[in-house]
Amino acid sequence: MVANSSYLDFTSYGTIPASVTDPATAYGLTNTQPVTGNAHITVAVVLNRANDPTALLNADWGTRQATLAQMQANGTLWTTYGADTGTFNTVKTQLGGIGTVLGDETGTGGYVTSAASRTIWVSLDAAGFQTLFGTPLMKGAAFGGAYEQLYWNGDLSLPASIASSTAGLWFDYGMDPATSALTSSTVALPQGAQSPGNQSTSATELYPQDIAALYNFPLSGPAHQTGTLALIEIGIGDALNPTIPGPSFQSRLQAYLATAGVPGSGAYYVQNSANERYNADNADERSLDVGVVSAIVPNSLIGLYVGSGDTVYTAYQTAIWDQQNNPAVISSSWSDGLSFAPGSPFATAYRELFVDAALRGISVFNDAFDGGSGNETGTGLTNLFTGSMSSYAMVVGGTSVSTLAAAQTDSTLAGVVLAAQQGDLATLWQMVRGGLTAWPVGAGQLEPFIETVWNQYVLSGSRLFPGYGENFATSGGVDTTQATPGYQTAFGLTPTDADPSHGVGRGAPDVSALSQGNMGYLLPGSNMLGVYPNGGTSAATPFWAALATEFNAIFKDQGLPNLGYSNDLYYIAAAIAPASFNDITAGNNVSTFIPGSTYTSPQLGGISATGLGYAAGQGYDLTTGLGSPNGLLLARALSSIAHAELYYDLTPVLENAGAPSSGASAGWSSTADQSLLFQSSLSHAGEWSLSLGSATYSFAGNAASPYAWTSALAQQSLQSDFSPTLVTLFDGYGQGQIVQTGVAAGTPLALSVSGTPATSHQAALTADYGFVDFVSGDGLSSVEVARPLAVATTANGANDADAVVRLRQNGVNDVSVMFYKVADYAGTVDGLAPGQAGYAEAAAAHAYSTISGQTTVSGSGYGAYSQTELAHVNAGDLIAMKLTSNGETYWAFASGNETVNGQHVAHLWSYGLNTWGWEDLYGGGDHDYNDLIVQLDFTSASGSHLLV
């Protein structure tokens, strides 16, 4: 027997009681009997890999990409990770004697059969099914005889000669899960909107490229050549309504682009067009996808993948294995809605598809879906389409974006609008973290005011409209059928579902973007005629895929490989460059229900709500993931990380030789003789302590102001269009305590807050980039350990490179900064340590010049932004700074600065990836450490300067 291979393991894991094992009972089938005659069912037999690629795919991105490129070049990639060729041929011959083998390595007919894909598709009649699986193929009348449903009883078996080589099975048979109530606990819903920020009476409607501009996408599509992008368009392709005559699909696409004001050819192709048929619902999805990507990356070749027309699986497979067009990015807004069991051959087959995509160097973006936490599935518990939740794909959730004009006509945002207009700091602080770059703004300006979770459900009396059975809220939650991916664990996450079982697994979504609500996309209609507002995570997903296509174009320009499987890079970016994402903190996706009589909902009839789901909050959450993109800042972060991983063996600021996997403070040690900053950010005044070797130092720490600058704000401020008003609005709010000292290589290090050891859950992501955060048990206080200097990770490991310098002044003094090369992490120059006689002269002799020949860079005035470039930077240079403020000199190393109460004063605060803030007043001033924000960027000036 093949374990976990029952029909309900294929379709209905977790959606019916475990005690229900009979498919006919689960689905309410009648007139059940064995299949006779000419009925066929098609199945993929997925063979074992010759070798397990898990270790390679768990390696860092740089190692992964370099290894895959080498294996591809020497022809060993698929002999290593495909099926054994001899085994493949033997099993194929055996299956050909039982049924009809379909497809080939090119995907003929919508089926890929090849040793590399490890897949053999075979069409079976009833006798062939019995021969291969040892059980009859059954049929029954479903929904009162509306259609005939195929199924089987019990587990499947395979001939021993095939079973030993088989890892997975997949039936090309579209089916929804059987469902029944799995809880009886219900709740009363509040009247009105179920989530804020989706009820404007003057919603904004924009073309996709204009929405991309709101998210600060790095490229202007028409000006750049971008790569091939695949859209999963099961069964529809470029089919048009045959009853409505008109121009070709190509002509209609070009007409849409012309209407949108986008120059571009609208080039596309269809894979397996013989399997496409016009269906209005499928066509609407297709036209949405095509409209989004063609308007944003109009120079990309767009592939429409039809597959067999029966399951999304086949469309994925043909896109992944298209070795002629080789799409670098796949976007899917489709899901095979069934719920397969973990450990089943069906789960293995589906999940290995995305492993193939990762090995092929393809980035996959899947939608979270549009059914809220319940996913339009009436079990009363939270649900996801587990087939789309692969840890090798980026799962995309949905938001609603409100301009000020839209917010002013949304009753759920009245309090936010009023607070912002009254200058409430807490409100503006949170909105800035959500992406606000200018304030105040005019009511007519197309600036995002606030972004919230997409959830348009409204209760009026006992009627939900829109309701839980309609596509009006982002799905999101936890796929407990698989383990938490390493990149989420490294980010400090333990995704836990809202069900009474509180299962742990893969959190979804990873990221989010506009779906609908208070803003919509202007897109072609289902028949590619006219322009209409549309949206959903079905729009947010190709939106992200278009952004990734821009990233690939930038990577190519900089000499990097395509992103490929790169989920880990996005999580690293969020940890070291948090301004890469807009943090959505308002809204929820609650939509769980069971059949009942409390409320009525379109598509569902009578329901009762069970109230399980997820709310947005600070940082990662299960409605919006890491957040929505700041495209340019994310591109810069990804570029920096990619070059660092490909070309450098970085020395982490600390290493952990023996700490538990929880990230506990014990076991950490210094990796070098180095000067380190210890920055406390306490939620309330209290003690924190630092242990270095056998010595422990305790500090009576002051609480940081609620508006003390964060890494996110510091990095956000380094955008040329970030409002000086917002910069100066948050001036003068003090940080906590800072201590700077030299630490010898190998010195053990531990930190405690209020007597309790602090833990570092993101050290694996940040230590290579010069800092580690140690967080208190309640998560409200932290101490960051950071270096006060930059390591020049230049693009491609090149010497004599230019480095971008970005400055934002938030102090009133005249300030300038000098950048100079030091010999080591302790800051020595020519054998002199900071503070020693002659150090200033030695530092000046090693100063970098700007491209205009200056050895200092001046601030541009209170609140102002400025930018320049350093010349002649070599790979691996260690770069430190000296600040001059009103005639006083301050060094990045406290030992070179003035002494107050017997202690040298630290004037520098770390704000993440190569970003620091200076305190420009003698003695430490107001301790806000934002008088001059400085960032060094070693990769954006490479190639064609696309990110400068």
Predicted regions and their residues:
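Short beta-strand-to-coil "C-cap" segments at the C-terminal boundary of structured domains/repeats
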Residues: 636-641, 935-942
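Secreted peptidase-domain scaffold signal
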Residues: 210, 524-528, 606, 611-615, ...
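An often Trp-containing, charged/polar helix-loop segment at the C-terminal end
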Residues: 552-618, 622
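Short glycine/serine- and small hydrophobic-enriched flexible loop segments
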Residues: 545-553
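C-terminal, well-structured subdomains that either form a transmembrane helix-short loop-helix hairpin
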Residues: 533-543
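Substrate-binding/charge-relay-adjacent region of secreted/lumenal peptidase catalytic domains
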Residues: 2-113, 121, 126-395, 451, ...
